[in-house]
C-alpha cells in the first residue's frame, strides 16, 4: 500500500509538472508569434528552433520578399550545410508579387486553419543550380496555404506538399532534367498536374483538374 501511494504521488507530481511545462510553452509561443517575430527570427529559439520566421500580411511586402530571397540564396545549393529555416505565414493575402523560392532544409507553412486562409502568389523550386537535374533537390516542404500562380516543384525525395491549394497548375520537374520521387497529399490543383520526368511519386487524397505525363512507379 505504501509503495502504491508513493507511485500515485509521483504520478500526480509529474502530471502537475507536465501541465506547467505545456502552459509555459504555450505562453512562449503566443508571446513570440503575436508580439515579437514578424519578419524576424522568433526570439526564443527554445520554442520553435533557430531561424524561424513568422510573417504577417501587414508586413512590408518588399521586406518579406527580400528576406525570403536572402534565405533562398543561402540554401539553393546548400545540400551539405547545417542551416535550417522555417518560413511561417499568418493568415491573410500576401499580394500579387511575392515569390517564394524554396531551397534546401526549408519549410514554408501557412498558419491558418484552412489552406485558403493564407494566400501566397508564387511557390517555386527549380534545379538551375544543378543544370536542371532535380535528382539532387532534397529536404524541403510546403504546407497549408494557397498559391495563385503556376508552380514548379522540381524535387526528388525527402520533400512533401501537404494541404496546398493551387489556383493554377503545377509541374514536378524542371524542363527536360531528371527528377525522381516525392509526396503530395491533401492538395487541390485547379488545372494540370504535370509529372514531367518524375518517377516513384506518391499521391494521396488529392483533387486535380487533370494529370499528365506519368513515367513509371506512380502511386495514387
What are these regions (language model features)?
Residues 53, 57-107, 113-116, 123-125:
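N-terminal extracellular ligand-recognition/capping segment immediately after the signal peptide
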Residues 90, 109-111, 121, 145-148, ...:
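Feature marks extracellular polysaccharide-active and adherence modules
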Residues 5-8:
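C-terminal motif of bacterial Sec signal peptides marking the signal peptidase cleavage site
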Residues 59, 93-94, 112, 124, ...:
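Residues at the loop-to-beta-strand transition
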Residues 10-12:
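Bacterial signal peptide processing site
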Residues 27, 31-40, 47-50, 161, ...:
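Predominantly polar beta-repeat domains that present long G/T/S/D/N-rich surfaces used to bind, process
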Residues 109, 132-150, 157-166:
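Parallel beta-helix/beta-solenoid
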Residues 63-80, 94-103, 133, 150-158, ...:
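Short, T/G/N/S-enriched strand-turn elements that build extracellular solenoid repeat scaffolds
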Amino acid at each position: 500500500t505504501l509503495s502504491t501511494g508513493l507511485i500515485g504521488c509521483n504520478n500526480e507530481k509529474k502530471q502537475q509538472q507536465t501541465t506547467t511545462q505545456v502552459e509555459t510553452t504555450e505562453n512562449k509561443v503566443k508571446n513570440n508569434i503575436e508580439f515579437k517575430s514578424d519578419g524576424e527570427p522568433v526570439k526564443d529559439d527554445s520554442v520553435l528552433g533557430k531561424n524561424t520566421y513568422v510573417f504577417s500580411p501587414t508586413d512590408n511586402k518588399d521586406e518579406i520578399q527580400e528576406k525570403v530571397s536572402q534565405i533562398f540564396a543561402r540554401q539553393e545549393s546548400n545540400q551539405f550545410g547545417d542551416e535550417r529555416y522555417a518560413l511561417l505565414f499568418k493568415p491573410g493575402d500576401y499580394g500579387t508579387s511575392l515569390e517564394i523560392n524554396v531551397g534546401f532544409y526549408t519549410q514554408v507553412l501557412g498558419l491558418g486553419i484552412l489552406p485558403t486562409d493564407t494566400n501566397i502568389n508564387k511557390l517555386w523550386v527549380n534545379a538551375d543550380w544543378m543544370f536542371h537535374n532535380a535528382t539532387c533537390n532534397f529536404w524541403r516542404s510546403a504546407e497549408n496555404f494557397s498559391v495563385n500562380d503556376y508552380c514548379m516543384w522540381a524535387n526528388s525525395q525527402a520533400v512533401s506538399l501537404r494541404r496546398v491549394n493551387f489556383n493554377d497548375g503545377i509541374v514536378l520537374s524542371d524542363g527536360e532534367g531528371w527528377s525522381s520521387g516525392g509526396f503530395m497529399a491533401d492538395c487541390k490543383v485547379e488545372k494540370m498536374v504535370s509529372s514531367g520526368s518524375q518517377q516513384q511519386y506518391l499521391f494521396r487524397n488529392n483533387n486535380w483538374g487533370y494529370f499528365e505525363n506519368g513515367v513509371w512507379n506512380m502511386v495514387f
